[in-house]
A protein has these predicted regions:
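Glycine-rich phosphate-binding loops of nucleotide-dependent enzymes
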Residues: 2-239
Length: 239
């Protein structure tokens, strides 16, 4: 059996007397796309931050290709081959889309290859026509796609996305879903998301968080029809 790409073992996080995440065991296979869902305060965002190095766990481990990255910081995790896109785009508003992607691609490519990678990425994210526009002038959805292009241009093995569809129009959500599915042909992804329409567009397997722990995990149709999941989203305490 192939070793998992990413794994957590008894991962927990406390903030003072509050147990935000409790003993989470999670496994992601090579090339898998996994969605993390749950109501506000369920623990999924804290779990995500431990995967990305924004928080160090109180106990337990995060393993990437078998290596313990539990105490690594975000910049160290990025160098290992994990691309991270948070809710707030981390782009340079005063630079063009092309310049933003060029800076990221230049970290791992050199010479003429950088320009080729940038052109390929602009086409991939559908922003060739906006390549020379300042990122600060882009619509919300375009800014999100620009940051996806930045993350992709560093050629990570695993991409972590935090609510990529937040604040988007229906058309932007549809295009983002298409882009995520296309990315998943060659990359593994973990996506934290609230938009159920978007989840149905992209997900095969879903992990549901409730009260800091994994409530249920399985195929998207099975999970979203599970009465425990419905109860959690309606505000009832899960059995």
């Amino acid at each position: 059996m192939a070793a998992p790409l990413l794994q957590t073992r008894d991962l927990s996080m406390r903030f003072g007397g509050v147990q935000a995440v409790r003993d989470v065991n999670f496994t992601l296979a090579e090339g898998e796309l996994r969605c993390l869902i749950g109501p506000n305060g369920a623990g999924k965002s804290t779990f995500f931050k431990m995967l990305t190095g924004q928080l160090q766990p109180s106990q337990g481990q995060v393993l990437f290709r078998g290596h313990d990255i539990s105490n690594a910081h975000a910049h160290q995790i990025a160098r290992l081959g994990i691309g991270i896109k948070t809710q707030v785009p981390s782009v340079f508003d005063g630079l063009s889309v092309r310049e933003n992607i060029w800076l990221a691609a230049g970290r791992i490519h050199s010479g003429k290859r950088v320009d080729g990678v940038v052109d390929e990425m602009l086409e991939r994210i559908g922003l060739t026509g906006a390549a020379n526009r300042l990122v600060g002038q882009l619509a919300h959805g375009q800014r999100q796609w620009a940051e996806l292009g930045i993350v992709l241009s560093t050629d990570p093995e695993l991409i972590l996305l935090d609510e990529p569809a937040a604040g988007m129009t229906h058309e932007e959500v549809y295009k983002t879903a298409e882009l995520v599915r296309e990315i998943n042909r060659s990359k593994a992804l973990i996506v934290v998301e609230h938009d159920m329409q978007f989840i149905r567009m992209i997900a095969r397997t879903v992990t549901v968080f409730s009260q800091g722990a994994v409530l249920v995990e399985g195929s998207v149709d099975t999970v979203l029809s599970d009465q425990r999941v419905k109860d959690v989203y309606l505000g009832r305490r899960a059995a």
